[in-house]
Amino acid sequence: MPKLGKKYRNAVKGVDLSLHLSFEDAVTQSIQTSFANFDETVDIAIGLGVDPKYSDQMVRGAVTLPYGLGKTVRVAVFCKGEKEAEAKEAGADYAGAEELVAKIKDGWLDFDAAVATPDVMALVGQVGRQLGPRGLMPNAKTGTVTFNVTNAIKELKAGRIDFKVDKAGVLHAPLGKVSFGSEKILGNLKSLVETVNRLKPSSAKGTYIKSMAISTTMGPGFKIDTNLVKKFLES
């Protein structure tokens, strides 16, 4: 195990990381133990009672966080003709078809999210190996393959995030910056948990949300008592 830095040790001094906390306490302590000299991101890890190797238990979706992510989201839109003009009007940072694909093949990936109209998906598929591993591949299930490019762009710019469980059944997502404060982080977390709850596969048996832990970029992870999920969503 790597040696923990002095700032980290000081931050967690006297803190019991084995406890399962309320949502409010976990968020507050995560923010309070932030120690980096930059505005850290607050992240959540949610362990789900699903087996992603079965397609009917794959949990993936998208949610627009009410308080955003505290960063500028660069959006590339794969489209042609009138849709290209519409995309630029809606705030797309890049819009086009063949020229964008050619740039990506040459190694260009200076954007944070991508949208595509259905008619150019065959073209976009040519750069699937570049986009897929970085989570940039447009997907109909998350609303990023659509002719309604204006709405998709506005959602992404407003703080929409796409998520899916990994092979271990764990879902990771950002919730904003430490500077947001507890109230906004909790608001974003509530929207995410509500969405994840709605996406519970009918084939999933037993406990659905099995574990939760929140942390900042450099900070420790604080466990959340999953027995409090219902109370949190009703609050």
UniProtKB/Swiss-Prot annotation:
Pfam hit, one: Ribosomal_L1
Top-level taxon of the source organism: Bacteria
Cross-referenced PROSITE patterns: RIBOSOMAL_L1
Listed GO biological process terms: regulation of translation; translation
UniProt GO molecular function: rRNA binding; structural constituent of ribosome; tRNA binding
UniProt keyword terms in alphabetical order: Repressor, Ribonucleoprotein, Ribosomal protein, RNA-binding, rRNA-binding, Translation regulation, tRNA-binding
One cellular component (GO) term of this entry: large ribosomal subunit
PANTHER family cross-referenced by the UniProt entry: 54S RIBOSOMAL PROTEIN L1, MITOCHONDRIAL, LARGE RIBOSOMAL SUBUNIT PROTEIN UL1M
Stated role: Binds directly to 23S rRNA. The L1 stalk is quite mobile in the ribosome, and is involved in E site tRNA release.
Family: Belongs to the universal ribosomal protein uL1 family.
Complex and partners: Part of the 50S ribosomal subunit.
Protein name: Large ribosomal subunit protein uL1
